[in-house]
Amino acid sequence: MKKAFPLCAIVALVTLAVSCADSHNKFAKMSDKAFENAMEQYAPLADSMIANRPGRLPHSIKPDGTLADVPPISWVSGFFPGSLWYIYEYTGNEAFKAYAEHFTHYLKKIQYVTKTHDLGFMMYCSYGNAYRLTGKEEYKDVVVTSAKSLSTRFSPAVGCIKSWEPRVGCNGVDQWDFPVIIDNMMNLELLFEATRLSGDSTFHKMAVSHANNTMQNHIRHEDYSTYHVVNYNPTTGAVEHQRTQQGFADNSTWSRGQAWAIYGFTLCYRYTGDVAYLEIANKLADFVIDNPRLPEDAIPVWDYNVGEEGFVPVKEYTPEQIAQKPRDASAAAVMASGMLELATYSNEAQAARLVATAEKMLCSLSSKNYTAKVGENKRMLLMHSVTAFPIGREIDVPLSYADYYYLEALLRWNKIFGAK
């Protein structure tokens, strides 16, 4: 089942004071400004991509300062068309609907790909939003076919969807034969939605199994932080390793990983109504809200435990690298969106905490400290995100998924508080 926002929760939320502004109206104006900025940045970017880089999608900035774009097979390919759909949804601007459809169609063949667990990111952010906003059957069919492709990666023995093909772990010692990453919680939405659209409960059952195993094995229940990678024995389903690939240490908390978990278990509650998911999502959120390591502006460092005693890094860092501590705007954007939805299902006191934190994140992201000036940042919206610090990949740069979840969070705020 797909849960609607409870009326009592919405009424309670509407009464909350907007924490980052003098008034509800001021936050709404900030949201309007963000989407105006998005239109000014993305229209020339879309035009340039169509004219000069057909078939590719913008994602980030390369070390040499040029735009980094990707082919449709990249795991991040769905975020730019998804952002265009969100701009169209917020503004009603038909030009952005045309842009969104154009870039969404680039991904059509990806519905048949079975070599990636990221089909949820790729196809639901693009085709899922396309179907939601247009109702076109062709988009619906692509969503269901994509879910069928994703389901081929599910192992009944493990009870999870395999994230990556077998590889040597980040420490250069472990052999990972069935690695599952916390990010994979985000791809469950594609499976849940496919059951809703097709009536085939197989997808739903796979998603629930994956979520339940993740809840048991990815979460440290003593403090509700998360592991990035859990490697399973592909035959017995036993846990063999709990590690990291993108975090500071195996026992540290990678900031975006925690964000994926909050968002992922919230969407599981939306589709199932299982209170275990609601409870775990709130505990995961509490880890962030009450964390003394969360900076004053609520935009987390790339990992919550960088350089701390008791956390042995997965690679050797210089003192300068440890001291660098770049922020990850993408983690904040994902958390803000997830927390706003979670607030609609939570009791009034917890909802107030969630909304206040999400609003603080969105206010920071909307400030000049994180939002690029029009014409700068290769026309991406947000600055200062991190993909994978341990391997030096995309550090302190814009990222397409930071923009996507930022726009989604602003849309959710407006829907909850009645501005849209």
What label would you give each PLM region?
Residues 24-420:
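Glycan-recognition and catalytic cores of secretory/periplasmic carbohydrate-active enzymes
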Residues 1-29:
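Bacterial Sec-dependent N-terminal signal peptides
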